[in-house]
Swiss-Prot record:
There is a cross-link at W90-Y244 (Tryptophyl-tyrosyl-methioninium (Trp-Tyr) (with M-270)). Belongs to the peroxidase family. Peroxidase/catalase subfamily. Pfam families: peroxidase (PF00141). It comes from the Bacteria. Its EC number is 1.11.1.21. Keywords: Heme, Hydrogen peroxide, Iron, Metal-binding, Oxidoreductase, Peroxidase. This is Catalase-peroxidase. The record marks R87 as: Transition state stabilizer.
């Protein structure tokens, strides 16, 4: 008989079949409440203040010393951890994608699942452990998010490269992001769903490394893959668990030209142009090596699947010593140059000076070596001084030589090392700062003086601000302009709601609503009339000596309209407004870069540019999360914007009131009215009409975005709060607070 005591519980809290198991298509409001104060050990902690007290130079000195302080438990290649730390920083920042601004290095997500267990991040668990003594020493003065990126910068400097600069300000979070869509594949390195096909299978399911079984590599080498590769938006990686591309080539097919197409697609989705892409690859591969000393079946589970005794480390390797010269990371065994811990242009020299032939790594992965045995004995071994090798390349490296667009850029960099150094410094800086938002968020002594277009620069604010009397006079002029409450509110919303909490881009500051591309967006139909009227008011006011920006006036006009609507509903009081916004110029606006901010759907205005396979309510939820809204804020804003008449194009969908322009709780009262029966009016169930149950008379029309507030249990519960007889006051207060929040989302100068 077993001596083991029987547990009184079969399962513990949080286990068992969940609502998501029963209803996988259910609207997931949890993404609106992630990273709450309950997950933080210090909700009131001011990271910017703590960072300013950091001895920055002492930290850099410690990081520099770490680079060559090789540890027996994970020895440094070539006696230098620099290349490992460059990869760590790159893979932290490299998850960023322009489509929705999510991913990136901004919150230290590499510490958490799924990123800490991605196949492309093998051995980065060790890199972060090497950093722990330094993180421990400096404590909360440096976040993991900043430390990971700074360490990559210091690594470059320690190997002789002059970086462009570094800015801190990335505050840590304490749990994994739930809002980021990394793809729908269920196996590591799967890619079938993102390309809309079932042909690409996982290469090493469950192992968490890049290496396939040898027999599976290149089975379809001669197949033209170009017609099949239409990567799903907003993804910026070709397979589940990769940062960008498969280094062996598309689907393991060692075709450099096809690889070039994948590289262009994925790097482009991370906001890099062709020159920046070549510079990043050529600069990054000036250092270090890849690791594929043995077969993939030697590698154990990733960190999230590993045993407790491994203490958060994963990929335990039973090949030889499991480390150093026996390390297995990607399964590729490549050393690019003879100076892997020193900045040089040798990577490009080797790429063009040798002719290359296909070979395989010890793990069976496709890679390339110089033909006719050339280059032998010129490259050092990472751990054995008595060994020498020939240089080697990845399929993705050869893309820089054989892609017709990359080749002339790479050749120019080869012949002009100073151009490569400058381009790499700038591209690296962009890579590690792309998701930080405006310069007001940047901290530290190494922030460059040069203003860069991709940072969405703004002119300096006029130190003289308008006063309360000026604000009151401007409100009166706006309300006397003949513009409706709905027009003013909708225009202010169109300006402010481009903000994305993911990469801190967009928002009302800059008044880019009046510039290309925003002025031509379908979602902004009708704002030109409002802008013309506001520009006239602005001109008249500014001729009097004081100045107001159009950015401020757009928000102030919407605020005045909300105040009027509240007053018409019987509520007194003002809506908060803080001036200080500025107007960006066309020269400060990158049209192509801003194009990705275009709202293809905005449920807050009942707008959809087209019919999409994703349900409208899920697009609304995505928008709400990017606006950093909570579920109550989402609910009250939709209900308020509907009765204010802020719908796109004056649509009556969801306007459940007979007094539009008045800030009432009618949307909720009428949606929850059981005397109304709803039925779809379109075959795709996108629009509905509500009829009186007794008379059959049509009372209202609505969209999926409207009806979800009565259908979804959680949203209905919130709607009931605002639709109750005692909910009207709370509705107005909450709407005003949520409105001001959205109007100031990009005001980092106030935070």
């Amino acid at each position: 008989m077993s001596n083991e005591s029987k547990c009184p519980f079969h399962q513990t809290a949080g286990g068992g079949t969940t609502n998501r198991d029963w209803w996988p298509d259910q609207l997931n409001l949890r993404i609106l409440h992630q990273h709450s104060s309950k997950s933080s050990p210090d909700p009131d902690f001011d990271y910017a203040k703590a960072f300013k007290s950091l001895d920055f130079q002492a930290l850099k000195k410690d990081l520099t010393a770490l680079m060559t302080d090789s540890q027996d438990w994970w020895p440094a290649d070539f006696g230098h951890y620099g290349p490992l730390f460059i990869r760590m920083a790159w893979h932290s920042a490299g998850t960023y994608r322009i489509g929705d601004g999510r991913g990136g290095a901004g919150s230290g997500q590499q510490r958490f699942a799924p990123l800490n267990s991605w196949p492309d991040n093998v051995s980065l668990d060790k890199a972060r452990r090497l950093l722990w003594p330094i993180k421990q020493k400096y404590g909360n003065k440096i976040s993991w998010a900043d430390l990971i990126v700074l360490t990559g910068n210091v690594a470059l400097e320690s190997m002789g490269f002059k970086t462009f600069g570094f800015s801190g300000g990335r505050a840590d979070v304490w749990e994994p992001d739930e809002d980021v869509y990394w793809g729908s594949e269920k196996v590591w390195l799967g890619g079938d769903t993102r390309y809309g096909k079932d042909q690409l299978k996982a290469q090493a399911p469950g192992q968490g490394d890049l290496v396939a079984e040898p027999a599976k590599h290149g089975e379809e080498q001669n197949r033209d893959l170009s017609a099949e590769r239409n990567l799903e938006n907003p993804l910026a990686a070709v397979q589940m668990g990769l940062i960008y591309v498969n280094p062996e080539g598309p689907e393991g097919n060692p075709d450099p030209v096809a690889s070039g197409k994948d590289i262009r697609e994925t790097f482009g989705r991370m906001a890099m142009n062709d020159e920046e892409t070549v510079a990043l690859i050529a600069g990054g591969h000036a250092f270090g090596k890849t690791h594929g000393a043995g077969p993939a079946d030697n590698v154990g589970p990733e960190p999230e699947a590993a045993g407790l005794e491994l203490q958060g480390l994963g990929w335990a390797n039973k090949f030889g010593t499991g480390k150093g010269g026996d390390a297995i990371t990607s399964g590729l065994e490549v050393i690019w140059t003879s100076t892997p811990t020193k900045w040089s242009n040798e990577y490009l020299n080797n790429l063009f000076n040798f002719e290359w032939e296909l070979t395989k790594s010890p793990a069976g992965a496709h890679q390339w070596r110089p033909k006719e045995g050339k280059g032998a004995g010129t490259v050092p071994d990472a751990h054995d001084p008595g060994k020498k090798h020939a240089p080697s390349m990845l399929t993705s490296d050869l893309a820089l030589r054989f892609d017709p667009i990359y080749e002339p850029i790479a050749r120019r960099f080869k012949d002009n090392p100073d151009q490569l150094a400058d381009a790499f410094a700038r591209a690296w800086y962009k890579l590690i700062h792309r998701d930080m938002g405006p310069l007001a968020r940047y901290l530290g002594p190494e922030m460059p003086n040069e203003e860069l277009l991709w940072q969405d620069p703004l002119p300096k604010a006029d130190p003289s601000t308008i006063g309360e009397q000026d604000i009151a006079a401007l409100k009166a002029k706006v309300l006397a302009s003949g513009l409706s409450v709905g027009e003013l509110v909708s225009t202010a919303w169109a300006s402010a709601s481009t903000f994305r909490g993911s990469d801190k881009r967009g928002g009302a500051n800059g008044a880019r609503l009046r510039l290309a591309p925003q002025k031509g967006w379908a979602a902004n139909q009708g704002v030109d009339k409002v802008l013309a009227a506001l520009e006239k008011i602005q001109g008249e006011f500014n001729n009097g000596g004081k100045k107001i920006s159009l950015a401020d006036l757009i928000v102030l006009a919407g605020t005045a309209a909300v105040e009027k609507a509240a007053k018409d509903a019987g509520y007194s009081g003002s809506v908060g407004f803080r001036p200080g916004r500025v107007d960006a110029s066309e020269a400060q606006t990158d049209v192509e870069s801003f194009a990705v901010l275009e709202p293809l759907a905005d449920g807050f205005r009942n707008f959809s540019k087209a019919r999409y396979s994703v349900k409208a309510e899920k697009l609304l939820l995505d928008k709400a999360q990017l606006l950093t809204l909570t579920a109550p804020e989402l609910t009250v804003l939709v209900g308020g914007l509907r009765v204010l008449g802020a719908n796109h194009g004056g649509s009556k969908l969801g306007v459940f009131t007979d007094k539009p322009g008045t800030l009432s709780n009618d949307f909720f009262r009428n949606l929850l009215d059981m005397s109304v029966e709803w039925k779809p009016t379109s075959a795709d169930n996108e629009t509905f009409e509500g009829r009186d149950r007794k008379t059959g008379q049509v009372k209202w029309s609505g969209s999926r975005v409207d009806l979800v507030f009565g259908s979804h249990a959680q949203l209905r519960a919130l709607s009931e709060v605002y639709g109750s007889s005692d909910g009207a006051d709370k509705f107005v207060r909450d709407f005003v607070a949520a409105w001001q929040k959205v109007m100031e989302l990009d005001r980092f100068d106030l935070k």
